[in-house]
A protein has these predicted regions:
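Short, exposed coil/turn segments at beta-strand boundaries within extracellular/luminal domains
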Residues: 16-22
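C-terminal edge beta-strand
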Residues: 22-29
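Residue-level recognition of secondary-structure-to-loop junctions
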Residues: 1-3
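Predominantly extracellular/secreted and cell-surface proteins with exposed
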Residues: 60-121
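Edge beta-strand at a domain terminus
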Residues: 146-185
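Acidic, glycine-rich flexible loop segments
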Residues: 99-150
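Extracellular interdomain linker/stem segments of modular secreted and single-pass surface proteins
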Residues: 29-36
Length: 185
């Protein structure tokens, strides 16, 4: 791939009997020198986002920074997300990767909810000012854990209700206050 980004790669294999199997994976291509992202503010968390009680909605606050230090191959920073109606307090403890491209930045890592557990998260931030004056900033966070008995990923929180917007500048929820800044180097 010639540019940093998230790419969906699909491989199809057909055996001598004509049976076909297809497997898809997302491939992350990052450039540690591409830039960084920072933001803080709040969103109105939609009903359906908090999987423990999908009826809940209301204000959720966030604060984050993700960047590569010089010579590093993993980003550093902090991420905090609080959804008071669901008594969900998420804090990051490690980052895996960061991709910055255009008005959008996305990064993945691990963290804890209410000081416990082992959760993964994916944060997407869109800087509306880089799209055009008057365009709103957008924020998405998906938090999940691995079910030990089934070895399946289980979503705990995801404010991306409209899955067709994923991967675009319309991904996430318009922020109600605060700002998101994607800095391209």
């Amino acid at each position: 791939f010639s540019a940093a980004g998230l790419y969906n790669v699909t491989v199809s294999v057909t055996d001598s009997s004509g049976l076909t199997s297809t497997v898809g994976r997302q491939v992350v291509v990052y450039d540690p020198s591409a830039g960084f992202v920072t933001g803080g503010g709040w969103i109105m968390s939609p009903a359906g986002a908090y999987k423990a009680d999908e009826r809940l909605s209301g204000r959720a606050t966030f604060g984050f920074v993700s960047k590569y230090l010089k010579g590093a191959n993993k980003p550093t920073g902090e991420t905090e997300f609080r959804f008071q109606a669901g008594v969900l307090n998420f804090y990051s403890n490690n980052y895996d990767w960061l991709v910055v491209g255009g008005a959008r930045a996305q990064y993945k890592g691990t963290g804890v909810i209410n000081g416990r557990g082992s959760y993964q998260f994916l944060l997407t931030a869109v800087d509306g000012d880089l799209i055009g004056k008057g365009t709103a900033d957008r924020f998405r966070i998906k938090i999940w854990h691995r079910d030990d008995s089934t070895n399946a990923d289980v979503t705990d929180y995801d404010n991306q209700i409209n899955s067709t917007a994923a991967g675009s500048d319309q991904e996430g929820t318009v922020i109600g206050g605060g700002s998101i800044s994607v800095k391209i180097r």
